[in-house]
């Protein structure tokens, strides 16, 4: 299953997301927000997305194969296409920890 990351899970579109190497740490936050909105926009148009962090594991190979300039840093990939509702992997759900297990909220119990 993990190898399918490198084939973009057979999606019709595979995106390689890069950042200019000279950008500061804040650019990662900006990119994360942009990718979030990209995923929301795709969903609004009936498309599904899947972020692929594994692509960065072989950034040198990807960079060479796609002739991406060296001043760009490969951050991740993104598969874009139509969700396959029948695929077993799309039915799998992990257990989720309750929010209280990893987050603390203070001051939200007062009325607005």
Language-model-detected regions and their locations in the chain:
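Acidic, surface-exposed loops and disordered segments
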Residues: 1-112
